[in-house]
Amino acid sequence: AVKRFVFASSVYVYSREGSFYRCSKQAAESYIEEFQNVYNLDYTILRYGSLYGPRADSTNGLFRIVSNALETGVVRYNGSPDAFREYIHVEDAAKASVNALGDDFRNQSVVLTGQEPMRVVDLLKMLAEILGLPESVEFIEGDYVGHYNRTPYAYLPKLGRKYVAPFHVDLGQ
C-alpha cells in the first residue's frame, strides 16, 4: 500500500508568474491536499527552485544558457539584469528530497532552493569567465511570460463579488 505521495512542484506555484506551468502545479497541490483530507493519504510536496547539474537538458534554463554560449561564444539571457535566482545543484536537491521523506515533512510543502539569492548577472559573468568568453553579457529584455525578478512569492488574495439581481422570484412564491 502507498504510505505517502511525494510530488515535485515549483517555487512558482503561488507566484504571479509561471504561466500555465504555475497553474498546473497549483491545481495538483490542491488535489493532493484534498485527497489527504478525504482519503488520509499522507503527502510531501517538494517545491524546487532553479536546478542545475548533470543530466540537464534543453528544458533547463541554465543548460540552455550554457549551450547557447558554447555555440555562439556569447552569454545571453532572456530577461532582466536585475533578476535574482536561488540555484540549487541537483545532488543537493536530491539529498534534500530524501531528507524530506522524514516524519517532520509529512503533509508539508518543502521549498528546495539554493543557499542564498544570486544576481543572474553575477552568475552569467562567472559563467563567461569559466568558459573563457568575454565577460560582457547580453540581456535581451522584454515581457517574458513566467519570469520573476526578485522573488517567485506573491500575495494574491482572490475576491469574488456577489451579484444580487434587483428583481427576483421570492422564496415563498
Task: Outline where the language-model segments fall.
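Conserved catalytic Lys-bearing alpha helix of Rossmann-like short-chain dehydrogenase/reductases
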Residues: 24-32
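Conserved beta-loop-beta element that borders a ligand/cofactor-binding pocket
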Residues: 9-10, 31-54
